[in-house]
Amino acid sequence: MACIENVLGGHAPSPTAVAAAENGNREPRPSLPFQCPKDDAGSWGHPGVPLRPPFKVLSDLARERLERPSERTGSCIPVDGWRALKPPYGPPPAVAEEPLATGEVNSSEGPAGWRQSGQDSINNVSQEFSGSPPALMVGGTKVSNGGTERGGSNAGLYVALPRGQGFFPSRGPQVRGPTHISTLRSGIMMELPPGSTRVTGKERLARVSFPLGGPRHPVKNWPRPMPLASSTTGLGSRTTAHCFIPPRPPSFNPFLAMPMAFAPPPIFGPPLPSCFADFPSWGMPAPASSNRENN
């Protein structure tokens, strides 16, 4: 009775379905005997064999292959336990000692060690772009391929590279001689003479020029007179009027366009009658000729 309850409850497949699955035929065989296992049995006809063998169970041949090094690869894997097969986390001890020693040296030197590491990286970059041995100076320390020279604690960075090599921005052309000191105030260029800027007395004179031309030649900035021939009747042929036309700026002119004033030429002719000056234009009397005709 208990056997039938187990079958109906779904704990095990029915004997009819088991027979059909084993023989490959889907037709049920009701003629098979119905057997009920005893209570001491493990399950319905299945022996108590584990699904997976234990991990530590190895044959003698496999143990010899693992313990002895192979002739081709020359590797040896110990089989003491699963910990030996597991790869260790992190670098091996020999590799881990090297950064540890480097850290100790840097910690003993302090900021000097950090500067040295930064210098090495910059030195590699500069050496990669330039073929010659570069000279590098960081924080007052000059580094070269030969040795190291330490100086004061300056905050500047000096990289000596030949011109046209590397991606460092090159400076402008350096002028060794004294240069002209020019200042631009309110649109007027003032150029001081070369030499010391501290001058006293009459030497404190500056040439003033407009910024239309070059700063070193202020005379060219002044407008040049342009003679214009007069076509007015009554004037001599030698009479000329001088007007100053400023040069045209190339792109931008800070000054507004100033109009050129010309004096009107004198008019030679009969003078106007004085009667028009005595009376205003709105109260002028009628002419005398018209009054005589009306009378």
From Swiss-Prot:
It comes from the Eukaryota. InterPro entries: DUF4645. Residues 10-48, 101-120 are annotated as: Disordered. This is Proline-rich protein 32. It comes from Bos taurus.
